[in-house]
Amino acid sequence: GKAVVLAVQREISKIKNCRLAEPGEFTKLAFQNGKINLLKAESIADLISAETEIQRLQAIKIMKGKSSDKFDELREKLLKILSFVEAKIDFPDEDLPAENFKKIKQDSLDVSNEINKILDDQKVGEIIREGFKIAIVGPTNAGKSSLLNNLSNREVAIVSEIAGTTRDVIETHLNIDGYPIIISDTAGIRDSKDEIEKKGIKLSLNKAENADLKLVVVDAKSIDLSGFLNDLLKNNAILVVNKSDLLQDKLDPEISKLNHVLISLKNNLNIDKLISKIKDSLKNKFISEEDILITRERHRQHLIQCANHLKNFSDKNDRKD
C-alpha cells in the first residue's frame, strides 16, 4: 500500500547522499548530458500526461526520433547554405563556380518546400496533444446543457427550464474511442439586456469560432437558422435538432441538406447517431500519414520564421538575377 511505499522512501532518504529525485530530474539530466534532445524530452512529458491511446501513440512516435532526425537533416542543409554565403561575403574577390550558386538556390528552395509541407498539417499534432475542441452552441433552452451532461454521463451543467441559466462556459474532458475531447457548454445566444449574460454570449461566440467542431443545438419546435445560426453552420458544424419526438412535420428540405441529426435527450433518442457523427469528424481531423508532427506552438513559430527567412533569401536572389 501507499503507507509502505512512503515508509521505504523515508528510510532510504536517511542514507547519506541519498534523496528522492525531483519530478522530471532524470529526463533533465539526460537532456543536459546530451543523451536526448529537447524534442524527445518534451515527448516524455507528453507520454506521462497522456490520457488517451492516441496521445500515447503520438508521444511514442516522437520519442522514436523521426521528427528529430528530419529537423537535424534540415539543419545540416541550412548550415551548408550558410557556409557558402559566409564564404562569398568573406572572400568576395574569389571566383566561386556558377554551379555552386545554382545549387545553393535549389537547396534553399528544397528546404523551404519541406518546411512548408511540415507546416501544412492542419495542426493535427497540437490537437492530439491538447485535445479536440467541441463547442455546444445555440439559442437558449434548446438542450445544450442536457447534451453536455448526456455525453459526459454525469451532471456537469445545471439544467433548468429558465432561459439563460448557463452564463459562463463549462468545459469537461472526454475520451471517445481514444480521441481526447474538450467539450464546452456555452451560454444560450439571444438578444439580452443583462450585462453578465451578454458577456457569456460573447464568450460563446468566441468559443464557437475557435472550436474544431460545433454542435449547433436547436429546438425542433422552433427551428430558425437565420442570423448567427446560419453563420455557425457554415463549416465544421453538426446541426443537432433536439426534442425531435415533438416534431410534427418533416424537416424543411434546406435543413435536411445540412449535416444534421435528430435527437431527443428526454427519450435518449439517436444519441448514438450523434456520437457516430462526432467520431467521423474526429477521424477526418486526426488523419495524418506523416511521421513528422508539430506538437507545440513554439515549434510551429520557429518553422514559420525559418520559412520566412528562406523566402526573403530566395526573393533577393531572384532580384539579383
Feature locations, PLM:
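Conserved beta-strand segments of alpha/beta enzyme cores
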Residues: R19, P180-I182, N259
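Inter-motif core of Ras-like GTPase G domains
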Residues: E197-A220
